[in-house]
UniProtKB/Swiss-Prot annotation:
The keyword Protease applies. Mn(2+) 1 binds at residues 271, 348, 350. Keywords: Aminopeptidase, Cytoplasm, Hydrolase, Manganese, Metal-binding, Protease. GO terms for biological process: proteolysis. Its EC number is 3.4.11.1, 3.4.11.10. This is Probable cytosol aminopeptidase. Its cofactor is Mn(2+). InterPro entries: Leucine_aapep/pepB, Macro_dom-like, Peptidase_M17_C, Peptidase_M17_leu_NH2_pept, Peptidase_M17_N. Binds 2 manganese ions per subunit. The active site is at residues 278, 352. The keyword tRNA processing does not apply.
Length: 496
């Protein structure tokens, strides 16, 4: 969808639909007031009749108003003036888009200035609104024989004052890039595991590299993984007919020699649990166990769209975890790329086994910071539910930067402790470390495991097990998170 930013009087614009806001006090301001005056009190009349209360999300369509060039005027309730939350703003954007899709017009004009959001400046408000519009546009129907109906809406114009045009344009540019990245993340996550396997992700990475001159792509197969000494990574993949892949995408947007930011994504394209097999109920959703890798893919796509002046390395640790006669057994001991040995007590704690070797591999890039993203633990879902990602790490400044980015992007994370006492739960009588730490503090002990492989750099871990996808029902599917958080973090580092 085309998005345009303008600073003109709303009643003078020729458009299929003009969207104006009404608050609960029903005192007309901004665009609604101008349209009301020009139309001879048409909006005041419907409010006096009680046709619209101004409650958040309510809509009322008016047509053929005199002296108004718009064919339709859509009144949208926004609740109490100045008290909109981020969540309410997104719901209003969804309500507007839903109403517009039900109309026949190919374009619409939205008076953005009249939306006042708590703790948001013009840029922040506009970006969230545009991201919400893009989210409402997303459809995944690749495998449907009857495709979703194509709506006629092709263009949206955002109205603002002259002083704010540059801020709104910047917000729209950032939002559209983030939305593109989220859509790619959702597409990859929603693909079935018989299509989206490690080799497929490697081919997608190659295609992205061919399309961008400043993106170098390397695909390491199982032979190369063995040469690198990635015994832990290979142990996860050895039960599957699908070969593993370590995908490395190196974006050079900054100066040569600038230390890169490294994103490491868990890419288990299907997780049965291996020999420690999962229950059958809900196992289909284990195709989403690669959403960490998918979010890194999507963040890179946003970075490419924005042409950020920084260097970013993306490492995707991709494998399939299957039971078979060649699968890893509980009790097996493997040697990681770092040289540390791991006793595998549970083959369903496989994400950390591929990540530990990928995190060791990241050292060679001499990074400014490393962030790994993984659907790692069910314990994180129990602790934080489906609204907030878990965040742990070894550097307070990095943690705070990510927390701040999450707040600005409305893609929040919450810090959990990484105290030394938890490390003791990973003690093994037979190896340097066990791959599980018992039933208590599972998210923390998983991060403790990873921390053993990140001592050479500043590191943070995002556990997105609760936020990467929605389970069951008509809304089931990948969410695209935490692309907004990660992209905001990189925007902040780039200073744009």
């Amino acid at each position: 969808m085309e998005l345009v930013v303008k600073s003109v009087s709303p009643e003078t614009l020729k458009t299929a639909t003009l969207v104006v806001t009404i608050n609960e006090s029903r005192v007309l301001i901004g665009a609604a007031q101008l349209v009301d005056i020009k139309s001879g009190g048409a909006i005041s009349a419907v409010l006096e009749r009680g046709d619209l209360a101004g409650k958040s999300g309510q809509t009322l369509l008016l047509t053929n108003l005199q002296n108004i060039k718009a064919e339709r005027v859509l009144l949208v309730g926004i609740g109490k003036d100045g008290e909109l939350s981020d969540r309410q703003l997104k719901k209003i954007a969804g309500s507007v888009l839903s109403s517009l899709k039900g109309l026949g017009g190919s374009d619409a004009v939205i008076a953005l200035d009249d939306l006042s959001v708590k703790n948001r400046d013009t840029y922040g408000k506009a970006r969230l609104f545009v991201e919400a519009l893009a989210d409402g546009e997303y459809v995944f129907d690749r495998f449907k024989t009857q495709k979703a109906e194509v709506r006629p809406l092709k263009k949206i114009t955002l109205l603002t004052d002259k002083v704010s045009v540059a801020d709104v344009e910047r917000a729209a540019n950032h939002a559209q890039a983030i939305a593109t990245g989220m859509a790619l993340t959702r597409d990859l996550g929603n693909l079935p595991p018989n299509i989206c396997h490690p080799t497929y992700l490697g081919e997608e990475a190659k295609a992205l590299g061919k399309a961008h001159k400043n993106l170098k792509v390397e695909i390491h197969d199982e032979k190369k993984l063995a040469e690198l000494g990635m015994g832990s990574f290979l142990a996860v993949a050895q039960g599957s007919a699908q070969p593993p892949r370590l995908i490395v995408m190196n974006y050079q947007g900054g100066k040569k020699g600038d230390k890169p930011f490294v994103l490491v994504g868990k890419g288990i394209t299907f997780d049965t649990g291996g020999i420690s097999i999962k229950p059958a109920a809900g196992m289909d959703e284990m195709k989403f166990d690669m959403c960490g890798a998918a979010s890194v893919f999507g963040t890179l796509r946003a970075v490419l769209e924005l042409k950020l002046p920084i260097n970013v390395v993306c490492i995707l640790a991709c494998a399939e975890n299957m039971p078979s006669g060649t699968a890893t057994r509980p009790g097996d001991i493997v040697t990681t790329m770092s040289g540390q040995t791991v006793e595998i007590l549970n083959t369903d704690a496989e994400g950390r086994l591929v990540l530990c070797d990928a995190l060791t591999y990241a050292e060679r890039f001499k990074p400014q910071a490393v962030i790994d993203i993984a659907t790692l633990t069910g314990a994180c879902v129990v602790a934080l539910g489906g609204h907030t990602s878990g965040l742990l790490g070894n550097n307070d400044a990095l943690i705070n930067q990510l927390l701040d980015a999450g707040k600005l992007a409305d893609d929040r994370a919450w810090q959990l402790p990484l105290f030394d006492e938890y490390q003791e739960q990973l003690d093994s009588p037979f190896a340097d470390i066990a791959n599980i730490g018992g039933p208590k503090g599972g998210t923390i002990t998983a991060a403790c495991f990873l921390s053993r492989f990140t001592k050479a750099y500043e590191w943070a871990h995002l556990d997105i097990a609760g936020t990467a996808w929605l389970s069951g029902g008509k809304d089931k599917g990948a969410t695209g998170r935490p692309v907004p958080l990660l992209t905001q973090y990189l925007l902040d580092r780039a200073g744009v």
